Regions:
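Extracellular/lumenal N-termini and interhelical loops of multi-pass eukaryotic membrane proteins
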Residues: 47-78, 321
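Reductase modules of NAD(P)H-dependent flavoproteins
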Residues: 68-78, 97-105, 120, 128-142, ...
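Transmembrane-helix exit/juxtamembrane "anchor" motif
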Residues: 97-121, 287-295, 369, 403, ...
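Intrinsically disordered, low-complexity terminal tails of fungal membrane proteins
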Residues: 120-222, 623-630, 668, 676
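Membrane-embedded alpha-helical bundles of multi-pass integral membrane proteins
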Residues: 221-418
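Membrane-proximal cytosolic interface modules of multi-pass membrane proteins
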Residues: 369, 374, 378, 382-392, ...
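FAD-binding FR-type
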Residues: 440-543, 559, 565, 637, ...
Length: 718
């Protein structure tokens, strides 16, 4: 300790970095006469008392105020912490409102098409409409026999077929060998083969003809078509899962939070501000975590796309909570009053909230999410409930923010309950694909192409706690299918839960082979996600790129477009499906499904190309495939596809086919939007992150002149 003397009756000492004041009482006076009856200053403690001296050490860090009550009251009167963070939330809402305004034109265009009001909301059972009946002239049209498809097991490229008028107008026939009109994926109990299990209504009459357009959906260009250069740069990949656009939003949000935490505040001496900032963002984190959230509904995006921002906002909240708590803990530790403060109820509640926030952050890491998903979910549910309760006990002004978060969570739980269906499902193991096919016949409507559901399997075969796990899977079938197959999921065997599901499906097949009907009870929740305000059928061309199990998204989208084309509700002229697999044997179980798609009498040209990337075990599969002819326009290639060439082919066909109607405006649906030119090309991609990066690069590299000619090129990632 260093000692210093002042001229007056009070002298200043320094004890390390703490200010020490010496008060020598005068004769006949007491400490009370000096105003020191209890504690001379808030958050101070008596270092020593001697007959003529009194040492008081001021705490280096105070609660809400500064070192003196007068300055604290002045600061409080000039700066309202609660109002400040409330204004921060208003800024966040204002930014959201701007984004919603940008999405309104396309949302309005979507909902002018009446069926869109009721699609993608609730899973249900619907009466299947009678399949489209062709007029007599079309029904009696000659059918071209099926010729053997082009098959190139060594070709490294898979470019799309060239365009010519004869090709687009010709009739062709899909294979009906071994398929009745009601083949409908009925299980072949005698063979039990995956090929028979996937069998679906392959039409025996399939000449491609022009349809009468009954109710074409209106088309509205997206901002990526209006501002292609800006969109291209925003979609550049910084690292897997992070684009420039996401990074920009994250950076802007971080700047706003840091600004709110530092403006007229020192986080080391005034930790209260960081607490206010953390509490104000709790509703943001909770709302972005819900499956049914208002921002997603307004923007037309699924919860899975907002989950990235939920995780980031959650990390910032945990950081702010720790800064807030450590400021007080440090001050109490130096003052030696840590245990005394823990006897105060609201301080104990604050410590509980701190522990909950850190536990949530720890169990939210990718390790726990990927390896121990059940632990991640359990800690999240328990941790959030305790955290919100502790915040209310810790700070009364925080209650409104907590109530908003609780209201959003409660609404989500109610909607999830409403969107859940209890049903009976059939399981089929697809050995070549390493997938389990789940079919729920009783649920046949209520979803849009590209959406997914969350499923629980209520079977002891999934383990003691298998019923507690809920997993998302893309829907691989079309709603209200004339094949009456219901909702179909294809679950890739990739983890413990999906492996148990695959084994359960195998046991189910053995039971059926012995004459026993076996299935499982499931809880299906959804649908969620999907293309949002984007209408695939409103474009002139479509390219779907799928990698591995991503074929479920592509199958659903293409089958939906085929059905809409049959009803005269599609503008599409060209549909191209590219599927990238490791082994060509993965094509075998899906040949009936592809045959069904290609055999439809559609106005649009359809081509499917499958590319395998590993030739090690390809010989046996190629030998099997060579024994039966592939349907027309289904091709198999070795090596990766040239997506740029394929996209160029789709653009050419979309532009050329539109010339048939050029000069006579096409009458749109309810939107009243007419067009005499192409309505753009949509590229849908589902698969590994690298595949999505390649697709974004190819879309961004389209020449501006060709982009304008076709009406824009947009991309949808699932």
């Amino acid at each position: 300790m260093q000692r210093g003397f002042g001229k007056g009756r009070r002298s200043l000492f320094s004890c390390g970095h703490l200010p020490v004041f010496l008060f020598p009482p005068s004769k006949g006076s007491s400490y009370a006469s000096l105003g020191l009856s209890a504690r001379p200053y808030p958050h101070s403690f008596i270092l020593t008392t001697e007959p003529n001296t009194l040492f008081i050490v001021m705490s280096a860090m105070t609660n809400v105020s500064s070192s003196t009550p007068s300055t604290s009251r002045q600061a409080a009167s000039k700066f309202d912490q609660g109002e400040f963070v409330y204004n921060l939330d208003l800024v966040v809402l204002a930014v959201l409102a701007v984004l919603v305004l940008f999405s309104l034109p396309r949302a309005f265009t979507r909902y002018t098409h009446l069926p869109e009001w009721f699609q993608g909301l609730l899973l249900h059972t619907a009466k299947i409409d009678v399949p489209v009946q062709l007029d007599k002239q079309v029904a009696e049209a000659p059918i071209t026999p099926l010729s053997r498809a082009y098959f190139s097991p060594t070709s490294p490229t898979g470019g799309g077929h060239g365009f010519n008028d004869f090709y687009t107008e010709k009739a062709y026939n899909g294979s009906d060998e071994g398929h009745g009109p009601r083949g409908n994926l009925n299980r072949n109990k005698s063979s039990g083969s995956a090929h028979a299990n996937l069998l679906r209504n392959t039409s025996t009459s399939s000449g491609r003809v022009r349809r009468t357009h009954v109710n074409l959906p209106s088309h509205m260009q997206g901002w990526s078509s209006i501002l292609p250069s800006v969109s291209h740069y925003l979609r550049l990949t910084i690292r897997p899962g992070l684009t420039v656009g996401k990074a920009f939003i994250v950076l802007a949000y971080t700047v706003a939070i840091v600004y709110a935490g530092l403006l007229k505040s020192n986080p080391f001496t005034q930790p209260v501000r960081s607490g206010w900032v953390a509490v104000s963002q709790v509703p943001v984190v909770i709302i972005l975590a819900t499956k049914n959230n208002v921002p997603g509904m307004l923007l037309g995006v699924g919860y899975e796309r907002l989950n990235f921002f939920h995780r980031y906002a959650g990390r910032l909240v945990v950081l702010a909570v720790n800064v807030h708590a450590l400021g007080f803990i440090y001050a109490w530790s130096i003052a030696g009053t840590f245990t005394q403060h823990l006897t105060v109820p609201h301080y104990r509640a604050g410590l509980i909230a701190l522990v909950c926030a850190d536990v949530l952050a720890f169990f939210s890491t990718s390790f726990w999410r990927n390896k121990f998903y059940s632990v991640f979910v359990a800690t999240h549910i328990i941790g959030v409930v305790v955290l919100l309760g502790a915040i209310c006990m810790h700070s009364n002004p925080s209650v409104p923010y907590v109530l908003i978060a609780v209201g959003a969570y409660a609404l989500d739980r109610v909607l999830r309950f409403v969107k859940t269906r209890y049903a009976y499902a059939h399981l089929t193991a697809l050995n070549e694909l390493g997938m389990t096919r789940i079919e729920v016949p009783v649920v046949n409507a209520g979803w849009r192409a590209g959406q997914h559901v969350r499923i629980r399997v209520l079977s002891r075969g999934m383990g003691w706690f298998g019923w507690a796990e809920c997993h998302p899977f893309s829907i691989a079938s079309v709603a209200k299918s004339p094949n009456e197959e219901g909702l179909v999921l294809m679950c890739k065997k990739a983890g413990t839960w999906t492996t148990k599901l695959f084994d359960l499906a195998k046991r189910a097949e053995y039971g059926e082979a012995g004459g026993y009907q076996h299935g499982v009870r499931v809880l299906i929740e959804g649908p969620y996600g999907g293309p949002g305000h984007t209408l695939f059928a409103s474009f002139s061309g479509a390219l779907f790129v799928a990698g591995g199990s991503g074929i479920t998204f592509a199958l659903s989208a293409v089958q939906d477009l085929v059905q809409k084309d049959l009803r005269g509700e599609s503008r599409l002229k060209s549909i191209e499906l590219v599927w990238i697999v490791q082994d060509p044997s993965m094509l075998i179980p899906l040949i009936p499904t592809f045959t069904d798609i290609l055999s439809q009498r559609t106005y649009a040209t359809i081509h499917i190309s499958v590319h395998y990337t590993q030739a090690g075990n390809a010989q046996s599969a190629l030998k099997t495939l060579s024994q039966k002819p592939l349907p027309k326009d289904l091709t198999l290639h070795a090596g990766r596809p040239k997506l740029a060439q394929t996209l160029s082919s789709v653009i050419d066909q979309a532009c050329a086919l539109s010339l048939f109607k050029r000069g006579a405006p096409r009458k749109s649906g309810a939107g009243g939007i007419n067009s005499t030119g192409p309505c753009g090309v949509i590229v849908g991609v589902c698969g590994p992150g690298g595949l999505a990066d390649d697709a974004r690069s190819i879309v961004g590299a389209v020449d501006s002149k060709r982009r304008k000619q076709v009406g824009g090129v947009e991309i949808h990632e699932e």
